[in-house]
Amino acid sequence: MLCVLGLSFAGFLTGGAPLKGGLAACLGLLLGSVGSAPADAVNRYTFDQLYLIDGIPLVGVALGIFGIAEIIDLLAKGGQIAERIGLGHGWLQGVKDVVQHWGIVVRGSLIGVWAGILPGIGATAGSWMAYGHVVAMAPDRERFGKGDIRGVIGPESANNSVEAGDFIPTLLFSVPGGAPAAILLGALYFYGIQPGPRMVQENLDLIFTIIWSFAIANTMGAALCLFLSPALARLTWIPFARLAPAIVVTIFFGAFQSSQHFGDIYAMLGLGLLGWLMKQLAWPRAPLLVGFVLTKPTEQYLWLSISRYGMEWLLRPGVIVLGLLLLASILWIVLGKRGGKNLPAEESTEGAVILGKVPSVLFTLSVFLVAAAALYEARSFPYLGAIFPMAATIPAIFMAVAQVVLDVRAAGGAPGIETRQKSKLALGYFFSLVLFLLLILLFGFGIATALFTFGFLNGWVKMRWFPALLYTGVVVGLTVLLSWLLGLYWPQGIVLEQ
């Protein structure tokens, strides 16, 4: 129930579109259900593809939903990311903002500690839960998603406290909550140190050393960021189209390294297009990622609860209290006691609907069809493998029906000429990324990087050939150097393999 409550923070309590947030969270749960079921010997939604048996990697989902989608959107808008403003003189104001919103710092930190204690949740979900909580508690929401400092303070407070919370199960019970804690646990085992109650008795000094090292590292990291932030912020003055090739190459290379399979890039591009559509239609994307991250711990805890108590676990006092809290939170938003006054119903933290009424209705209908098809497919799974997808798809179907009604009744018409032009431009940039993938499949990552970078700069940016060649050489050289230093594998093309 704690995981479900976390989903509500990121889904129903994000912005003024609770149904869209809930649907996005259910989509994330459904994406996370792809692959081998942890509680039964069944492969779900794999379509006979070996790649999908282990599920879709988190890296591909995050880079697609946010990275690729934002790249396409920024390229379509054109220009630079930020205006030229004075930098390096806002540190004192930042301190004042933190002091002014000290309550957000405390609540965000507590959410982060809780996310760290629960295995499998981690910093990503904890940060978005904190963001959803801040948005839900704010009396005015118009500025969220547009630079409101409260939307930075809450998630960063949670992000900084997640690892601290992760120390509790890791050091006391040998149960890591995430990848960093697992690495720490492995290092302790390597030196013959057994985390657990005995460690508290025999190696208490080491525990305090770890805690102080973490605190000092955070302080030094913050100081370094303050020192470098003016120089790094000036990158936002550069026209984004000039930065895009290097960013795209980095994202493609990073996505491939998660499992070293081309399926990672396929998934990233597909989810990137989905993320762009969600942004244009004012669907919050954060709940989808949080739902995906929470799928594994939620299903594991559900399986354990059913295995131990049957369906009677729903009648336990703690579950009832959390369920009532969840229901009250949802009703609070849906009935408009807090949320409906300040943010239009069709608007979320992603902004207003851009593509118009008809695409919005069609997109919601597509979500309905996906949920219905997933529910029908789940009927063929064994009980323990089917209960979680059903728990995700049944609410999604009802919410999709309600959202279709809202979309049909909402005011709005066809998008304007400028919107249609930007949409066509965005699709053109997306197909450029697809072309990059095809080049990788044919010639391998190195040659494809050179061809894509030079072609993008020469075609889209209209950069002269000599600076474009120099830029291309730097990108390829840095990629080669990084691969050599870290021992990373380059995807090979069909032509080079023959």
Predicted regions located by residue number:
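Hydrophobic, small-residue-rich transmembrane alpha-helices and their short perimembrane loops
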Residues: 103-198, 205-213
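Helix-loop-helix hairpins and the membrane-proximal interhelical loops
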Residues: 45-148, 233, 250-256
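Long, contiguous bundles of hydrophobic transmembrane helices that form the permeation core
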Residues: 26, 42-47, 73-100, 336-363, ...
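Hydrophobic, membrane-inserted alpha-helices
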Residues: 3-9, 108-112, 162-167, 227-228, ...
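Membrane-embedded alpha-helical modules
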Residues: 1-79, 190-325, 334-335
